[in-house]
């Protein structure tokens, strides 16, 4: 341990503490990574090396793991570099009881955060204030933070899938779309909800809202083991299209993806 660094940054975990927490026998400091890896590669017959090269941030051209995979391939051209992201993704889809419990807690925190947001929502409030009401609640109640940058889009801003500036005023008779979630012990909630800024839907807003709600319920009813996300998405799109046709917003089902 570096006493100077610990004075500035706080106490660091020792190797023995890391072993006990991770339950992994061989643990070392990150600054020995290159020498350990080089020793293995020069003394052992290594044919395949796996990297998780999933791009976690939509704006990142290359994240840390992708950079490390590229550097490795250049340094050891005789070894095949393979992507283990699909394997890890499949493993992550299967949750044990402890994981489900943590996800439920993340959802509970998110639910309470939304209730706090709704209690303060009113015309004249800024989108970032609605965001702050949510994020204050989840942090105060034990969340690690947010699952992803909170989306709080009022009016036309709610039509943008990844609107994150959250800087406009929430006006009377408009809707506020929220895409948000709390993270708890590494597990994330992800919920989208839409509320009338003044607390009451207009007639047209209610009609559209009820079509979306019907699609949500239809997907929940149809969902079962073995179904693909594409199949569930098709269920959703059909209910949305039928509802929009009834309201006169579109004429044919295939138009649902145009707006």
Label each PLM-derived region with a short phrase.
Residues 1-259:
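Active-site neighborhoods and metal-handling regions in enzymes and metal-associated proteins
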């Amino acid at each position: 341990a570096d006493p100077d660094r610990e004075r500035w940054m706080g106490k660091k975990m020792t190797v023995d503490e890391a072993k006990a927490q991770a339950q992994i026998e061989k643990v070392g400091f990150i600054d020995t990574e290159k020498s350990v890896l080089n020793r293995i590669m020069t003394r052992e017959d290594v044919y395949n090396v796996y990297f998780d090269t999933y791009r976690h941030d939509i704006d990142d051209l290359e994240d840390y793991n992708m950079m490390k995979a590229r550097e490795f391939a250049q340094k050891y051209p005789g070894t095949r570099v393979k992507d283990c992201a699909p394997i890890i993704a499949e493993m992550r889809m299967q949750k044990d009881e402890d994981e489900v419990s943590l996800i439920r807690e993340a959802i509970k925190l998110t639910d309470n955060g939304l209730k706090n947001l709704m209690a303060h929502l009113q015309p004249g409030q800024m989108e970032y204030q609605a965001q702050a009401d949510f994020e204050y609640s989840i942090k105060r109640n034990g969340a690690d933070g947010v699952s992803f940058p909170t989306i709080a889009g009022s009016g036309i801003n709610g039509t943008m899938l990844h609107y994150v500036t959250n800087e406009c005023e929430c006006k009377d008779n408009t809707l506020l779309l929220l895409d948000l979630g709390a993270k708890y012990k590494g597990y994330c909630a992800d919920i989208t909800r839409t509320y009338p800024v003044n607390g009451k839907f207009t007639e047209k807003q209610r009609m559209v809202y009820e079509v979306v709600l019907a699609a949500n319920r239809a997907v929940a009813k149809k969902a079962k083991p073995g179904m693909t996300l594409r199949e569930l998405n098709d269920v959703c799109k059909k209910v949305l299209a039928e509802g929009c046709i009834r309201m006169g917003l579109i004429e044919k089902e295939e138009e649902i993806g145009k707006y």
